[in-house]
Amino acid sequence: MAQIDFRKKINWHRRYRSPQGVKTEHEILRIFESDRGRIINSPAIRRLQQKTQVFPLERNAAVRTRLTHSMEVQQVGRYIAKEILSRLKELKLLEAYGLDELTGPFESIVEMSCLMHDIGNPPFGHFGEAAINDWFRQRLYPEDAESQPLTDDRCSVAALRLRDGEEPLNELRRKIRQDLCHFEGNAQGIRLVHTLMRMNLTWAQVGGILKYTRPAWWRGETPETHHYLMKKPGYYLSEEAYIARLRKELNLALYSRFPLTWIMEAADDISYCVADLEDAVEKRIFTVEQLYHHLHEAWGQHEKGSLFSLVVENAWEKSRSNSLSRSTEDQFFMYLRVNTLNKLVPYAAQRFIDNLPAIFAGTFNHALLEDASECSDLLKLYKNVAVKHVFSHPDVEQLELQGYRVISGLLEIYRPLLSLSLSDFTELVEKERVKRFPIESRLFHKLSTRHRLAYVEAVSKLPSDSPEFPLWEYYYRCRLLQDYISGMTDLYAWDEYRRLMAVEQ
């Protein structure tokens, strides 16, 4: 196992215009302060205020959005990071681990990773993801890319259909089809930060949001040693070269994770579990008393000193005494949140320290709060009650189905841009209006300038005389559409769908 030295991981250099001659702790901290400014002031962070956490298109400002959720995750991440550093200081290990002059950057990377962790999520959350992937699967049929004979291939895109005698090109076609049918919020976050927003963050800061290490074009089983880390796609084919450079800069082996990402993940797990239940009470899906009974029933028999007793029962008893002259529900969630944090944060911090050799190497194949402990059971309890009583509620399910329909409908509306031939689409990009394509011209004008420029830049770097050019061009055209639609807020997507379907004046 390699020696633990965080000076080899907290890399403050950038992809472009990297600072030179940096020597002191203060100078390094200023670089990460610059990262904070770039992130907090980015439009992608602002758009989170109109993206779903659990309840789409919610008008009640007390119910969480992706932005308020991310701010809560940021605070919990800061708490865990400080707890880890405090414990390492008590053990006199800060200097041994190269952290004695990097405590500020350590905390800042964790905080900003938490704030950005949902930055790539599409409108309507997981149902938006599912809509994008289902729509592309119904046209690209990635499973047919393994088919024999090749005539069984149902792919509706000529450039990506498998052809006899073109094996090197067929392998690229397989990768592209698989990649486009595995849109994922975390992978889109990497694309957003590097390719679309060009935020030019430090290598360490980007490493903090690379939650999953599986390429989106991966086919087949993942290695058992990295099964958890490769649970979902973490980056796209379009960012393959950037991620290869990132791994080199952060000394990460293939499919390994950046150490501070485990802290961000734990902060997210702790935050959303309690928050989802609180939002459900705010939405009157159930009362606080009903929630307590749901939790009590799901946990089952327990001793007086059990974690359930110390966290949930304690919160319930204190809220009923109403000593602070506040509503029972306000008090219950205040105590539940405090009790949960006071138990889970120290536990997550100690798990990080206990498993630091594997975490530093990037190979710890678990989440910090997924084990056989009572702390893990408490999180599962919150999640299971939310799944059973919140996510399955008719109002929630109806909104999710509407969200799925909106995203599917928008993709269908913009489909003419994907139906154009390579030469016709190239002409449209160059002229921006082509008389014989009135619909396509108007759809193209609606696309964001940022996304169009990303497409143009990517295609301009391709050798136009290569046999691979039509494949890559179509790939980036699909990315253009995915970028545009996934970047919408819930409300904008809803309004745009209604306008283009002519269902309102």
From Swiss-Prot:
<dbReference type="InterPro" id="IPR023293">
    <property type="entry name" value="dGTP_triP_hydro_central_sf"/>
</dbReference>
<dbReference type="Pfam" id="PF01966">
    <property type="entry name" value="HD"/>
</dbReference>
<dbReference type="InterPro" id="IPR006261">
    <property type="entry name" value="dGTPase"/>
</dbReference>
<keyword id="KW-0378">Hydrolase</keyword>
<dbReference type="InterPro" id="IPR020779">
    <property type="entry name" value="dNTPase_1"/>
</dbReference>
<dbReference type="InterPro" id="IPR003607">
    <property type="entry name" value="HD/PDEase_dom"/>
</dbReference>
<feature type="domain" description="HD">
    <location>
        <begin position="66"/>
        <end position="273"/>
    </location>
</feature>
<dbReference type="GO" id="GO:0008832">
    <property type="term" value="F:dGTPase activity"/>
</dbReference>
<comment type="subunit">
    <text>Homotetramer.</text>
</comment>
<dbReference type="InterPro" id="IPR050135">
    <property type="entry name" value="dGTPase-like"/>
</dbReference>
<comment type="function">
    <text>dGTPase preferentially hydrolyzes dGTP over the other canonical NTPs.</text>
</comment>
<dbReference type="GO" id="GO:0000287">
    <property type="term" value="F:magnesium ion binding"/>
</dbReference>
<comment type="similarity">
    <text>Belongs to the dGTPase family. Type 1 subfamily.</text>
</comment>
<dbReference type="GO" id="GO:0006203">
    <property type="term" value="P:dGTP catabolic process"/>
</dbReference>
<dbReference type="InterPro" id="IPR006674">
    <property type="entry name" value="HD_domain"/>
</dbReference>
<protein>
    <recommendedName>
        <fullName>Deoxyguanosinetriphosphate triphosphohydrolase</fullName>
        <ecNumber>3.1.5.1</ecNumber>
    </recommendedName>
</protein>
<keyword id="KW-0460">Magnesium</keyword>
